[in-house]
Amino acid sequence: MQFFYTPNFNPIILKVGCISFYWYGMMYVLSFIFAMWFLKYRKRYIVNDIFSSTSEIENLLYLNFLGVVIGGRIGYVLFYQWSMLSQDKLWFFKLWEGGMSFHGGLIGVIISIMWFSYCKNQSFLKISDFIVPAVPVGLGLGRLGNFINGELWGRVTFDIPWAMLFKNALLQDLLTLKIHPEWKFFFDYYGALPRHPSQLYEMILEGIVLFVVIYIFSCKSRPEGSISGLFLLLYGLFRIIIEFFRQPDIHIGLINNFITLGQVLSFPMVIFGFIIMYVSYKFK
């Protein structure tokens, strides 16, 4: 029988008394630190006509961070886990347990940029173009955090040598066996069903690849809005592709037995991204 790797990470970095520090939360801290450094670098060497001082960048990042956390959590509750609030009223605040929605976080960031651009009398797209190149690194680190937590695993596969066994997928495995009882032999042998490590797929595509493309594209002067449009377009496409390998949420499943909620939420990103890029180049 083929060997499949079983990730077995402790989600807690260290524990001091009754306080625990989690890898998932650390990914947000690292993302914030990188964004702070990278955007100051962009102001100094690439774009220097938007902010009068680095303190303005810091203020914007604080707003964005709040937008990501609040919007991401609200989005996750509304889109994926509304029922959890009825079981645990404080669950909304347990961010260390995971459970963030990119699309909700995106809405939160958009609102924070709108507020900042209004207060500073700056163009919304000009500011978003400045910020966007720093976003993919945060996305990649977030997916790494998902992998360490053993969540958001992929669909069952027996055809690839890098398939993995996720212990936290036990309930999903048992439900899958009801549909595919012929896989019970593999479940009994491995103790789990081998799955795509879709968190790592997302880390590579939405983190590394997207960062490289957006960074190279943003190093030259571009029409206002084109960088933001390219980000929306590429992220939407990458997410739609990866969703075919990612296990749909257990309580939602496939919509019309074909499409996932993540794909439904990503299609508008592709459309709006294309429109923004088209308009930005047509009227530059």
From Swiss-Prot:
Recorded source organism is Blochmanniella floridana
This protein is called Phosphatidylglycerol--prolipoprotein diacylglyceryl transferase
Write out the pathway annotation from the protein's UniProt entry.
Answer: Protein modification; lipoprotein biosynthesis (diacylglyceryl transfer)
Q: Which GO terms describe its cellular component?
A: plasma membrane
InterPro entries referenced in this protein's UniProt entry, alphabetically: Lgt
Q: Which UniProt keywords apply?
A: Cell inner membrane, Cell membrane, Membrane, Transferase, Transmembrane, Transmembrane helix
TM ranges? 19-39, 60-80, 98-118, 130-150, 199-219, 225-245, 258-278
Q: Where in the cell is it found?
A: Cell inner membrane
Quote the function comment for this protein: Catalyzes the transfer of the diacylglyceryl group from phosphatidylglycerol to the sulfhydryl group of the N-terminal cysteine of a prolipoprotein, the first step in the formation of mature lipoproteins.
- One MF term in GO for this entry? phosphatidylglycerol-prolipoprotein diacylglyceryl transferase activity
Give the source's domain of life in one word. Bacteria
Any one Pfam family match given in the protein's UniProt record, by short name: LGT
Membrane topology per the entry is: Multi-pass membrane protein
Give the binding site residues for a 1,2-diacyl-sn-glycero-3-phospho-(1'-sn-glycerol): R143
Q: Does the keyword Membrane apply?
A: yes
One BP term from GO: lipoprotein biosynthetic process
Q: Does the keyword Cell membrane apply?
A: yes
According to its UniProt record, the EC number is 2.5.1.145
Protein family membership: Belongs to the Lgt family.
